[in-house]
Amino acid sequence: MEMYFKRMKDEWTGLVEQADPPIRAKAAEIAVAHAHYLSIEFYRIVRIDPHAEEFLSNEQVERQLKSAMERWIINVLSAQVDDVERLIQIQHTVAEVHARIGIPVEIVEMGFRVLKKILYPVIFSSDYSAAEKLQVYHFSINSIDIAMEVMTRAFTFSDSSASKEDENYRIFSLLENAEEEKERQIASILSWEIDIIYKILLDSDLGSSLPLSQADFGLWFNHKGRHYFSGIAEVGHISRLIQDFDGIFNQTMRNTRNLNNRSLRVKFLLQIRNTVSQIITLLRELFEEVSRHEVGMDVLTKLLNRRFLPTIFKREIAHANRTGTPLSVLIIDVDKFKEINDTWGHNTGDEILRKVSQAFYDNVRSSDYVFRYGGDEFIIVLTEASENETLRTAERIRSRVEKTKLKAANGEDIALSLSIGAAMFNGHPDYERLIQIADEALYIAKRRGRNRVELWKASL
């Protein structure tokens, strides 16, 4: 890639050097005068494509993209020799964002085609001479084509790397502590089954019972299990079993009086038992040949490291957009960790990180993700958790750590606390924006005295 970018730098530099200065000046003049119009027209046309629309439907994104597009047009069409290296880096950065969000390369290519199409009448409606118009158009189109090539090549490289990480994460997830995960999920679905059966046998209210897809097991399967075992036939079988039983469950919940009829009650209980039994059999088959593998895991805390953060965020954001379900993030910092580490030593610091990590695991669901983000900072991705549920989870974790007892080597008690920033997904497709606003909330929590939870609001 380095050699390629050097070659493109030489080509772009050559294009700028060969163009007459008055022609370059006129191209820059066109860009400055018409960038706003070109940006608006560009997104108007691009949004007609339904595939592109899904990436541009967020109002905040559209507003930011329009202003970014204006700057991009001015930068590319006003390029001087000294600007070329910086412009190549800009294309690389834009490509990384596109890959991170998951914008397909064909949408990017369509965008460049649209830009060149709408630029033509703008240039040829100017009061330049016919020869000047042709030269300005030639310089502008070649500049855009070089920028497009650099961006597309960088995008393909980033997207390919992301695809490899997606597959690496799938394999890691499949292999990581598989036996324990299998037993945990079997216990989860059995607990759900027992809860419903007891309520039916004791004539208790079923109103608080959840359909299988919304129970802990169902959430784990939809957010993790499907991905772990992608492409294996048993996944489809489990999906159908969950879907079919949810239909029966919802129908029963609409008229619970039917359960007073013994034959209907027995039929419903057998449907529960058969569904759970089949799912457990299929789960055992899926996990049967899986063994432990720890690539992608933080050795000290046994949490995920940040390697798979893009893969998971991209998938969960796509799921949230597709289903309309909530998604939230907690960024967590151990208060005064450096001071504790410096005072009591690294062994004590490591023990604190292990205890804090255990508090995370004990207070999240199996469908959530916990990462060691770096040092004493952690990220938790909460799937299908409302704002209230997100804050309750954060407060539970904070309270648990505050009550954790830890003694230094000399017997002195060490006080532990966490500052937590929370943020709800608001439709912006770039996960780094979600992390950024959660980080802003974390900063507020620290500024307001630490040992507290703050939820990001636009007014913060």
Swiss-Prot record:
The GO terms describing molecular function are:
carbon monoxide binding; diguanylate cyclase activity; GTP binding; heme binding; metal ion binding; oxygen binding; protein homodimerization activity
Organism the protein comes from: Escherichia coli (strain K12)
The subunit structure is: Forms a complex with DosP.
The record's catalysed reaction(s) read: 2 GTP = 3',3'-c-di-GMP + 2 diphosphate
Q: SUPFAM superfamilies recorded for this chain?
A: Globin-like (SSF46458), Nucleotide cyclase (SSF55073)
Q: What is this protein called?
A: Diguanylate cyclase DosC
Supply the source organism's classification: Bacteria, Pseudomonadati, Pseudomonadota, Gammaproteobacteria, Enterobacterales
User: Which keywords does UniProt give here?
Assistant: GTP-binding, Heme, Iron, Magnesium, Metal-binding, Nucleotide-binding, Transcription, Transcription regulation, Transferase
Question: Has keyword Iron?
Answer: yes
The protein's Enzyme Commission number: 2.7.7.65
Which of this chain's residues are annotated to bind substrate?
N341, D350
Record site: Involved in oxygen binding and important for the stability of the Fe(II)-O(2) complex:
Y43
Describe the task this protein carries out.
Globin-coupled heme-based oxygen sensor protein displaying diguanylate cyclase (DGC) activity in response to oxygen availability. Thus, catalyzes the synthesis of cyclic diguanylate (c-di-GMP) via the condensation of 2 GTP molecules. Is involved in the modulation of intracellular c-di-GMP levels, in association with DosP which catalyzes the degradation of c-di-GMP (PDE activity). Cyclic-di-GMP is a second messenger which controls cell surface-associated traits in bacteria.
- Please name the Gene3D superfamilies in this protein's record: 3.30.70.270, Globins (1.10.490.10)
Which gene specifies this protein's sequence?
A: dosC
Q: Which Pfam families match?
A: DosC_2nd, GGDEF, Protoglobin
| Gene induction | By RpoS in the late exponential growth phase and upon entry into stationary phase. Expression is higher at 28 than 37 degrees Celsius. In rich medium DosC and DgcM are the major RpoS-dependent GGDEF-domain containing proteins in the cell, whereas in minimal medium it is the major RpoS-dependent GGDEF-domain containing protein. Highly expressed on solid medium. A member of the dosCP operon.
